[in-house]
């Protein structure tokens, strides 16, 4: 890899509570992660990204942080983190950790101090407290609706028992938003960055990187019907044409997403990271439209990468895929950044299910047994394998979410009483939420909890079908999804595809993408009808080929 390793890296997302459990309490932990790192090095990824493991009440699976500079006992200790980090570096893996700057837990010492302090105090200034509307302040300060459902405001109770001010929380009421106009907040996060950089981490994935700053005056806002809960356009495409609205000053979207002032924060953070050697990076989770706006987060003096959610949200159709690939590369190149590519993460339906849905499912809503348009699992896995084979042939950096290398589908049939996503509770079960993509991984088909841990205890129940997806059933088995991923990553590296240039090849029909990247010709058939492959030795394919015929929902790499 080049010194700018992040430009080409294949980065594997670990959701710690669901990856591997070393102590048998049903919750994944840092010792479990450390024990399985050789499997990831063998898979062929370049780096790992860890979702939050910080001290937390776990009201939102760790994205409600009570102490940014310590490890929650659920996951271990700082010593366990240091051991895991050292082992990753020994294996040649970079380590990126999640950082959650938009909000803290309501159990964070600062917020507890704010609740105990008077309105207008320095303690309350760290968060966004406001008096309510109405004759007695009984109404929220504005009409904003939480990402998880319900009002974005919660009223406090004064020490004497009378109703008090309201505080803002874009997400759950247990996640109060910081006031990023306050220098004390900014200085605290510089300290947090340095704490982890000094320990040796290679970078940060920044949660809700398009949040933090709110519009002056906190004006009322009603999002359009097609808006995603996290800020981007919900579907991304219309009639096969990417929705790329022009950027105007008046077209800024929600007053709590993508405000211009957030870029000052990241320019400041970039200066902190540049004090350290080893190309430490910032990766933005920024759900904004269009891609030209996303590119603002990765200008040369800001962050290094931004997740390409436009690509993730693109359907398995040739024309929109080609459009978003071209537009992504062009848009990010204009600011000197690589495009990233991602198909799954801990907030969306796994792509082995999502790509076969026959009805829309809004981002963050999830699917369950009563959802319309539930996927055919055979079709879903076939499309997922083909989509991954296309993604890993593209230049730039690619993200892989734990379990997708096993072909895991969304766990649809979780019992209601087992669900833990705040979305499920705040919408009274109207939205299933994200639990289905967070179920603990299967490692060994015949072991307790399918090898996730030494006991049968798991924080979310594992479906019985997990046995057939277990890693030990796929390791070394030709044609398995695990071996497909290993081959794709090995060939991607050997043939320098991450630094290549694309040349589209015409003449294969409306449902087929054919693109040359260096020494590889990639042919992806998104339709149902088979097509004849051009000349060239087949390097690999996402499904079994019939001679020189490429079946539907299949991608092949050929020697160009």
Task: Please name every model-derived segment.
Residues 541:
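A short, gly/pro- and small-residue-rich
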């Amino acid at each position: 890899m080049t010194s700018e390793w992040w430009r080409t890296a294949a980065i594997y997302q670990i959701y710690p509570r669901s990856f591997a459990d070393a102590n048998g309490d049903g919750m994944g932990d840092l010792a479990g992660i450390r024990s399985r790192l050789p499997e990831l090095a063998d898979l062929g990824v370049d780096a790992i990204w860890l979702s939050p493991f910080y001290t937390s009440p776990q009201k939102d699976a760790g994205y409600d942080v009570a102490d940014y500079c310590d490890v929650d006992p659920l996951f271990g200790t700082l010593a366990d983190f240091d051991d895991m980090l050292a082992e990753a570096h020994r294996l040649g893996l970079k380590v990126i950790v999640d950082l959650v700057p938009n909000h803290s837990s309501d159990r964070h010492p600062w917020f507890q101090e704010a609740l105990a302090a008077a309105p207008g105090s320095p303690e309350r200034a760290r968060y966004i407290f406001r008096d309510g509307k109405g004759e007695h302040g009984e109404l929220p300060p504005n009409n904003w609706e939480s990402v998880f459902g319900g009002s974005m405001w919660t009223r406090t109770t004064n020490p004497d028992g009378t109703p008090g001010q309201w505080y803002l929380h874009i997400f759950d009421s247990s996640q109060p938003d910081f006031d990023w106009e306050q220098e004390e907040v900014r200085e605290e996060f510089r300290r947090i960055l340095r704490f982890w950089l000094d320990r040796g981490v290679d970078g940060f994935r920044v949660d809700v990187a398009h949040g933090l700053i709110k519009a002056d005056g906190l004006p009322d806002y009603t999002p359009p019907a097609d808006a995603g809960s996290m800020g981007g356009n919900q579907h991304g495409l219309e009639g096969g044409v990417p929705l790329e609205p022009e950027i105007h000053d008046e077209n800024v979207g929600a007053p709590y997403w993508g405000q211009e002032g957030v870029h000052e924060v990241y320019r400041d953070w970039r200066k902190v990271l540049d004090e350290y050697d080893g190309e430490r990076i910032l990766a933005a989770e920024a759900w904004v439209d269009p891609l030209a706006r996303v590119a603002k987060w990765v200008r040369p003096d800001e962050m290094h990468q931004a997740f390409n959610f436009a690509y993730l949200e693109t359907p398995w159709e040739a024309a929109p895929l080609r459009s978003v690939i071209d537009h992504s590369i062009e848009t990010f190149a204009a600011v000197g950044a690589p495009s990233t590519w991602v198909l799954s993460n801990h907030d969306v339906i796994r792509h082995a299910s999502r790509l076969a849905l026959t009805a829309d499912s809004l981002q963050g809503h999830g699917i369950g047994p009563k959802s319309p348009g539930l996927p055919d699992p055979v079709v879903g896995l076939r499309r997922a394998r083909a989509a991954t084979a296309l993604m890993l042939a593209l230049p730039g950096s690619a993200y892989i979410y734990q379990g997708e290398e096993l072909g895991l589908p969304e766990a649809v049939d979780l019992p209601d009483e087992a669900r833990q996503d705040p979305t499920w509770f705040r919408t009274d079960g109207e939205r299933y939420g994200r639990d289905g993509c967070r179920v603990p991984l299967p490692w060994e088909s015949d072991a307790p909890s399918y090898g996730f841990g030494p006991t049968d205890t798991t924080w979310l129940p594992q479906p019985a079908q997990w046995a057939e997806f277990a890693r030990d059933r796929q390791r070394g088995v030709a044609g398995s999804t695990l071996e497909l991923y290993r081959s794709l990553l090995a060939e991607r590296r050997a043939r320098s595809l991450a630094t290549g240039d694309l040349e589209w090849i015409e003449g294969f029909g409306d449902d087929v993408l054919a693109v040359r990247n260096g020494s590889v010709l990639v042919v992806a058939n998104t339709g149902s009808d088979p097509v004849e492959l051009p000349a060239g030795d087949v390097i690999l394919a996402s499904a079994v080929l019939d001679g020189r015929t490429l079946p539907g929902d299949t991608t092949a790499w050929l020697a160009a």
